[in-house]
Swiss-Prot record:
Alphabetical list of CDD domains matching this protein: cpn10
Annotated protein name in UniProt: Co-chaperonin GroES
Protein localization: Cytoplasm
PROSITE patterns associated with the record: CHAPERONINS_CPN10
Main location per the UniProt record: cytoplasm
C-alpha cells in the first residue's frame, strides 16, 4: 500500500536505535526508548498561508529528521510502523 499525505503532513519511518551501549551492554526492547529520529518517506503538497498563497514544505523525501518521542500518529502499513505528522512537529533536518 502506498500512502500519500495531505496538506502539510509527512510520513516518517523511525530509524532503528542501537540495542547495545558503547560498553557492550545489551538493552532489552522493553527498556529502550522510542527513537526520536526518522527518515521522511513521503511529503504532502503543502498548505495555504494567511494570504491564500500555497506554501510548499521544507522537508523532502529521504531527509533524516528529529521529532519528539510522542509526535505524530502511528499507523501500520504492510507490517511497518510509520508516523504521520505535521511538518511543524519536526524539530530539525539532520545534515549529511
Amino acid at each position: 500500500m502506498k500512502l500519500r499525505p495531505l496538506h502539510d503532513r509527512v510520513i516518517v519511518k523511525r530509524l532503528e536505535q542501537e540495542t547495545k551501549t558503547a560498553s557492550g551492554i545489551v538493552i532489552p526492547d522493553n527498556a529502550a526508548e522510542k527513537p526520536d529520529q526518522g527518515e521522511v518517506l513521503a511529503v504532502g503538497p503543502g498548505k495555504r498561508n494567511d494570504k491564500g498563497d500555497f506554501v510548499a514544505l521544507n522537508v523532502a523525501v529521504g531527509d533524516r529528521v528529529l521529532f519528539g518521542k510522542y509526535s505524530g500518529q502511528t499507523v501500520k502499513v504492510d507490517g511497518d510502523e510509520l508516523l504521520v505528522m505535521r511538518e511543524e512537529d519536526l524539530f530539525a533536518v539532520v545534515g549529511k
